[in-house]
Amino acid sequence: MTQQEIKLIAFDLDGTLLDSVPDLAVAADQATRAVGFPGVTELQVRDYVGNGADILIGRALSQSLTINPELSDELRAQARELFDDFYQQTGHKLSHLYPTVKETLKELHQAGFTLALVTNKPSKFVPDVLQQHGIADYFVDVLGGDSFPEKKPNPIALNWLMEKHQIQPTEMLMVGDSKNDILAAKNAGCASFGLTYGYNHGEPIAASEPDFVADSLAQLLDVVLVSA
Protein backbone atom coordinates (compact mmCIF):
# COMPACT_ATOMS: atom_id res chain seq x y z
CA MET A 1 0.00 0.00 0.00
CA THR A 2 1.10 3.52 -0.76
CA GLN A 3 -0.74 6.60 0.38
CA GLN A 4 -1.68 7.47 -3.20
CA GLU A 5 -3.47 4.15 -3.66
CA ILE A 6 -6.08 4.42 -0.91
CA LYS A 7 -9.60 4.88 -2.28
CA LEU A 8 -11.83 3.40 0.42
CA ILE A 9 -11.51 3.81 4.18
CA ALA A 10 -13.52 1.48 6.42
CA PHE A 11 -14.15 2.58 10.00
CA ASP A 12 -15.13 0.72 13.11
CA LEU A 13 -17.71 2.59 15.23
CA ASP A 14 -17.64 1.84 18.97
CA GLY A 15 -14.30 2.78 20.50
CA THR A 16 -13.09 4.30 17.22
CA LEU A 17 -15.51 7.08 16.32
CA LEU A 18 -17.89 6.88 19.26
CA ASP A 19 -17.50 6.29 22.99
CA SER A 20 -20.72 4.33 23.45
CA VAL A 21 -19.81 2.50 26.66
CA PRO A 22 -21.76 4.80 29.02
CA ASP A 23 -25.05 3.83 27.34
CA LEU A 24 -24.05 0.20 26.79
CA ALA A 25 -23.15 -0.09 30.48
CA VAL A 26 -26.54 1.24 31.60
CA ALA A 27 -28.34 -1.26 29.36
CA ALA A 28 -26.11 -4.21 30.31
CA ASP A 29 -26.51 -3.44 34.01
CA GLN A 30 -30.29 -3.27 33.71
CA ALA A 31 -30.47 -6.46 31.63
CA THR A 32 -28.33 -8.58 33.96
CA ARG A 33 -30.24 -7.38 37.01
CA ALA A 34 -33.57 -8.04 35.28
CA VAL A 35 -32.72 -11.75 34.94
CA GLY A 36 -31.58 -12.00 38.56
CA PHE A 37 -27.83 -11.65 38.07
CA PRO A 38 -25.46 -9.08 39.60
CA GLY A 39 -25.19 -5.79 37.75
CA VAL A 40 -22.11 -4.54 35.92
CA THR A 41 -20.16 -1.29 36.06
CA GLU A 42 -19.07 0.97 33.23
CA LEU A 43 -15.47 -0.07 33.91
CA GLN A 44 -16.37 -3.73 33.43
CA VAL A 45 -18.28 -3.03 30.23
CA ARG A 46 -15.27 -1.19 28.77
CA ASP A 47 -13.50 -4.54 28.95
CA TYR A 48 -16.43 -6.60 27.67
CA VAL A 49 -17.30 -4.72 24.46
CA GLY A 50 -15.91 -5.24 20.98
CA ASN A 51 -17.26 -8.61 19.87
CA GLY A 52 -20.94 -7.84 19.40
CA ALA A 53 -23.94 -7.68 21.73
CA ASP A 54 -24.31 -11.43 22.28
CA ILE A 55 -20.76 -11.70 23.58
CA LEU A 56 -21.14 -8.54 25.66
CA ILE A 57 -24.19 -9.95 27.43
CA GLY A 58 -22.54 -13.34 27.92
CA ARG A 59 -19.57 -11.64 29.55
CA ALA A 60 -21.79 -9.40 31.68
CA LEU A 61 -23.74 -12.40 32.98
CA SER A 62 -20.45 -14.19 33.65
CA GLN A 63 -18.77 -11.13 35.20
CA SER A 64 -15.76 -12.13 33.14
CA LEU A 65 -14.19 -11.88 29.68
CA THR A 66 -14.58 -15.66 29.58
CA ILE A 67 -18.23 -16.61 29.21
CA ASN A 68 -19.48 -19.18 31.73
CA PRO A 69 -20.32 -22.32 29.68
CA GLU A 70 -23.06 -23.20 32.17
CA LEU A 71 -25.18 -20.22 31.11
CA SER A 72 -28.15 -21.54 29.13
CA ASP A 73 -28.88 -20.34 25.62
CA GLU A 74 -32.36 -19.38 26.79
CA LEU A 75 -31.02 -17.15 29.57
CA ARG A 76 -28.53 -15.45 27.26
CA ALA A 77 -31.24 -14.88 24.65
CA GLN A 78 -33.59 -13.42 27.26
CA ALA A 79 -30.89 -11.11 28.61
CA ARG A 80 -29.92 -10.06 25.08
CA GLU A 81 -33.52 -9.16 24.25
CA LEU A 82 -33.78 -7.10 27.43
CA PHE A 83 -30.44 -5.46 26.69
CA ASP A 84 -31.66 -4.37 23.25
CA ASP A 85 -34.79 -2.86 24.79
CA PHE A 86 -32.87 -1.04 27.51
CA TYR A 87 -30.24 0.19 25.07
CA GLN A 88 -32.93 1.59 22.79
CA GLN A 89 -34.46 3.35 25.80
CA THR A 90 -31.20 5.11 26.67
CA GLY A 91 -31.59 7.20 23.53
CA HIS A 92 -27.78 7.01 23.27
CA LYS A 93 -27.70 10.26 25.24
CA LEU A 94 -24.52 9.43 27.15
CA SER A 95 -22.51 8.42 24.07
CA HIS A 96 -20.24 10.97 22.40
CA LEU A 97 -17.86 11.25 19.47
CA TYR A 98 -14.16 11.18 20.24
CA PRO A 99 -12.17 14.39 19.61
CA THR A 100 -11.47 15.30 15.94
CA VAL A 101 -13.84 12.63 14.57
CA LYS A 102 -16.35 14.87 12.81
CA GLU A 103 -13.68 17.18 11.41
CA THR A 104 -11.60 14.28 10.12
CA LEU A 105 -14.54 12.54 8.43
CA LYS A 106 -15.56 15.81 6.80
CA GLU A 107 -12.08 16.41 5.42
CA LEU A 108 -11.75 12.85 4.09
CA HIS A 109 -15.19 13.10 2.49
CA GLN A 110 -14.34 16.40 0.84
CA ALA A 111 -11.06 14.93 -0.42
CA GLY A 112 -13.02 12.30 -2.36
CA PHE A 113 -12.41 9.15 -0.34
CA THR A 114 -15.16 6.53 -0.17
CA LEU A 115 -16.00 6.03 3.51
CA ALA A 116 -17.67 2.93 4.92
CA LEU A 117 -18.64 1.80 8.40
CA VAL A 118 -17.96 -1.79 9.47
CA THR A 119 -19.12 -2.44 13.02
CA ASN A 120 -19.94 -5.46 15.16
CA LYS A 121 -22.80 -3.41 16.66
CA PRO A 122 -26.32 -4.72 15.82
CA SER A 123 -27.44 -3.04 12.59
CA LYS A 124 -30.75 -1.75 13.97
CA PHE A 125 -28.99 0.67 16.34
CA VAL A 126 -26.48 2.12 13.90
CA PRO A 127 -28.48 4.56 11.70
CA ASP A 128 -29.95 6.44 14.66
CA VAL A 129 -26.56 6.73 16.35
CA LEU A 130 -24.94 8.09 13.19
CA GLN A 131 -27.76 10.57 12.60
CA GLN A 132 -27.77 11.69 16.21
CA HIS A 133 -24.08 12.56 16.07
CA GLY A 134 -24.22 14.18 12.64
CA ILE A 135 -21.97 11.78 10.73
CA ALA A 136 -24.44 9.59 8.81
CA ASP A 137 -24.02 11.40 5.49
CA TYR A 138 -20.29 10.68 5.29
CA PHE A 139 -20.73 6.92 4.82
CA VAL A 140 -21.59 5.24 1.53
CA ASP A 141 -22.00 1.83 3.19
CA VAL A 142 -22.99 0.99 6.77
CA LEU A 143 -22.47 -2.66 7.71
CA GLY A 144 -23.58 -3.90 11.12
CA GLY A 145 -22.63 -6.99 13.08
CA ASP A 146 -25.55 -8.94 11.66
CA SER A 147 -25.16 -7.81 8.03
CA PHE A 148 -23.22 -11.02 7.31
CA PRO A 149 -23.05 -14.49 8.90
CA GLU A 150 -19.71 -13.65 10.57
CA LYS A 151 -18.40 -10.61 12.42
CA LYS A 152 -14.90 -9.11 12.51
CA PRO A 153 -12.20 -10.48 12.64
CA ASN A 154 -13.77 -12.41 9.76
CA PRO A 155 -13.05 -10.32 6.63
CA ILE A 156 -16.40 -10.98 4.93
CA ALA A 157 -17.60 -7.36 5.26
CA LEU A 158 -14.32 -5.95 3.98
CA ASN A 159 -14.29 -8.42 1.10
CA TRP A 160 -17.86 -7.39 0.23
CA LEU A 161 -16.80 -3.73 0.15
CA MET A 162 -13.89 -4.48 -2.17
CA GLU A 163 -16.12 -6.43 -4.52
CA LYS A 164 -18.86 -3.78 -4.51
CA HIS A 165 -16.48 -0.90 -5.19
CA GLN A 166 -14.22 -2.91 -7.51
CA ILE A 167 -11.03 -2.15 -5.62
CA GLN A 168 -7.96 -4.13 -4.61
CA PRO A 169 -6.84 -4.74 -1.00
CA THR A 170 -4.05 -2.21 -1.52
CA GLU A 171 -6.72 0.44 -2.15
CA MET A 172 -8.53 -0.03 1.18
CA LEU A 173 -7.61 0.96 4.74
CA MET A 174 -9.32 -0.33 7.90
CA VAL A 175 -9.46 2.05 10.88
CA GLY A 176 -10.19 0.64 14.32
CA ASP A 177 -9.35 0.40 17.99
CA SER A 178 -9.31 -3.36 18.61
CA LYS A 179 -7.48 -6.47 17.52
CA ASN A 180 -10.65 -7.61 15.74
CA ASP A 181 -10.35 -4.62 13.42
CA ILE A 182 -6.67 -5.22 12.76
CA LEU A 183 -7.16 -8.95 12.22
CA ALA A 184 -10.07 -8.32 9.85
CA ALA A 185 -7.79 -6.07 7.80
CA LYS A 186 -5.00 -8.64 7.77
CA ASN A 187 -7.48 -11.36 6.77
CA ALA A 188 -8.72 -9.17 3.91
CA GLY A 189 -5.18 -8.31 2.83
CA CYS A 190 -5.55 -4.57 3.42
CA ALA A 191 -3.65 -2.12 5.60
CA SER A 192 -4.84 -1.09 9.05
CA PHE A 193 -4.76 2.06 11.17
CA GLY A 194 -4.94 1.32 14.89
CA LEU A 195 -6.05 3.82 17.52
CA THR A 196 -4.60 3.65 21.02
CA TYR A 197 -7.84 4.68 22.75
CA GLY A 198 -11.07 2.71 22.65
CA TYR A 199 -11.85 -0.85 23.69
CA ASN A 200 -9.24 -3.57 23.31
CA HIS A 201 -9.57 -5.54 26.55
CA GLY A 202 -6.60 -3.73 28.09
CA GLU A 203 -4.20 -4.87 25.38
CA PRO A 204 -2.15 -2.22 23.53
CA ILE A 205 -3.30 -1.95 19.92
CA ALA A 206 0.34 -2.04 18.83
CA ALA A 207 0.46 -5.68 19.96
CA SER A 208 -1.79 -6.54 16.99
CA GLU A 209 0.76 -4.93 14.65
CA PRO A 210 -1.37 -2.54 12.61
CA ASP A 211 0.39 -0.74 9.77
CA PHE A 212 -0.14 2.58 11.56
CA VAL A 213 -0.67 3.43 15.23
CA ALA A 214 -2.13 6.77 16.33
CA ASP A 215 -3.49 8.52 19.40
CA SER A 216 -5.97 10.64 17.44
CA LEU A 217 -8.16 10.06 14.41
CA ALA A 218 -6.87 13.34 12.96
CA GLN A 219 -3.51 11.62 12.39
CA LEU A 220 -5.25 9.58 9.70
CA LEU A 221 -5.11 12.66 7.49
CA ASP A 222 -1.32 12.54 7.55
CA VAL A 223 -1.43 8.96 6.29
CA VAL A 224 -3.90 9.26 3.42
CA LEU A 225 -3.73 12.88 2.27
CA VAL A 226 -0.75 13.33 -0.02
CA SER A 227 0.22 16.83 -1.06
CA ALA A 228 0.20 17.48 -4.77
Curated annotation (Swiss-Prot):
Keywords noted in UniProt: Carbohydrate metabolism, Hydrolase, Magnesium, Metal-binding
Gene name of the encoded protein: gph
Cofactors demanded by this protein: Mg(2+)
Gene Ontology CC: one annotated term: cytosol
Cited HAMAP family: GPH_hydrolase_bact
Coiled coil: none
Protein name per UniProt: Phosphoglycolate phosphatase
Pfam families tied to this protein: HAD_2
